[in-house]
Each structure stands twice: as C-alpha cells, then as structure tokens.
C-alpha cells in the first residue's frame, strides 16, 4: 500500500473522536454538515536518496475541518484546530514521524462571511527512511 495513504489512514484513526475519514474527492453541501466534519486527504510524496540503498520519504496529508457556524464560535474552533494540529508534531504514525504542521488557511474569512461555514486546513508533513 502507498506510504502516504498509510499516513492518511493513521491520521484519520488518531482523529476518530471527530469521525475523521480519508476521502479522495471531498465535496459537501453546508446543509449536510451538522457537526464538525474532518476530512483527511493524501497530498504528496517526495523521495530523496541518502545512499545507494536508503532514501528519505517526505509524506504530506491535509486535514480539513468544516463546521457550520459564525464569528462568535471562531476563537474556540481555532483553539481546537491548533491543538489538534500541534498534537501531531513529533508523533510517530505508520512508521513515519511528523516533522511539520502548517495551518493554511487557519480559517477562511470568505467561507465564514459568505457561507456561515468555518473552514480550516492543516498540512502535516511526515518523514521516514527506507
């Protein structure tokens, strides 16, 4: 199985309290989102040779958070998303270690204003050696 898919499934498993799921084509209607929706998407794999027999792999996944809500809920949602993202840093999953957490966007003002939807995306970078 693909290493980046293994990481995506491990991340979703870690976020099982939020009913996270791995999806390849996430698409939702706001009316279908009652609770926070957490989606994990495999994003990228990068390989760098270290020697003739070993290489480094950088595996990236994105974790999307969607919730119907307004500006009054924003501080709590931001704290939740930041806490979840930072909780992965230095954590080992599926044989790889999380070496980077990026929030992009930490939230989307456009989605909040125009749709009444909180949208946040975390990009997690993992490193492993083979």
Q: What residue spans do the PLM features occupy?
A:
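Charged, amphipathic alpha-helical segments and their flanking helix caps
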Residues: 1-30, 43-130
